[in-house]
Amino acid sequence: MVDITDIDSIRKFVIDNNIKIIVNCAAYTNVDKAEEDYDTALEINYGGVCNLTDVCREFGIYLIHISTDYVFNGRSNRPYKTSSECDPIDSYGTTKRLGECYALEYEKAIVIRTSWLYSEYGKNFYTTMINRIIERKETNVVCDQVGSPTYARDLAEFIIFLIEKQDEEDIEAHTGLYHFTNNGCCSWYDFAASIEQLRKSKGRNDFIKPCKTSEYPTKAERPQYSVLDKTDLYEFPYEPRHWLAALRHCMMNDNKIKEH
């Protein structure tokens, strides 16, 4: 494992392994904790990205960096384009914006903004909801924040698609900023309710309850609407599947569901 806050560690890893492309998925992602631990979030989300970018520039290698929908304020009512003005409203979004700006100054960098990332592994919204449903615990989920869930497998496949382009054509023709999420949008409540419905457990299936953001106060403010416009993907061409189709795929692969 490489510590991205240690530039010497990155440089050594690149030299020892003859790296040609770096894909940076590392980030400080605890949105609420970032409000009180801003320095650490900044060190990772900005300082770490600066280190990666500088090493990539030093060796002339490509950088693919993952960013977030939280660079927007969420006050729009239409999908945000890559050209839309950024205005983060929390510390997490602010540090991620600083990082992506630095990366985009490098001509061999690709920055991919994504949103509501989940998978059947680790700790994320999906696994939290599955655990709550299996444990038959009532859960209030906000119904007035809208975005696009993104299955981590689908994001990974898009990244692989970009990397494989270097075998077909110059990847440098496709550097810059892109948005990638699964198609469609929903509220967090819709997402959670869909998980509950698709699980199709016997007996009661109403453990997920809607609530307003005002009823669920958090330390960090979150965008009310953060749907990302993916028009730029069509130039490849590349079209992500709908978030519900991706969710079904995730749940089919989830061993925890099979066990319960």
Pin down the residues of each PLM region:
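NAD(P)H-binding glycine-rich loop region in Rossmannoid oxidoreductase-like domains
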Residues: 4-44
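SDR active-site strand-loop-helix element
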Residues: 22-26, 63-68, 73, 112-114
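NAD(P)-cofactor binding segment of oxidoreductase domains
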Residues: 36-64
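Catalytic helix-loop patch of NAD(P)-dependent Rossmann-fold dehydrogenases
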Residues: 43, 48-51, 71-112, 116-119
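NAD(P)-dependent short-chain dehydrogenase/reductase
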Residues: 101-148, 152-161
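Mid/C-terminal beta-alpha module of Rossmann-like enzyme folds, strongest
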Residues: 165-219, 258-260
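C-terminal amphipathic/interface module of NAD(P)-dependent oxidoreductases
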Residues: 221-260
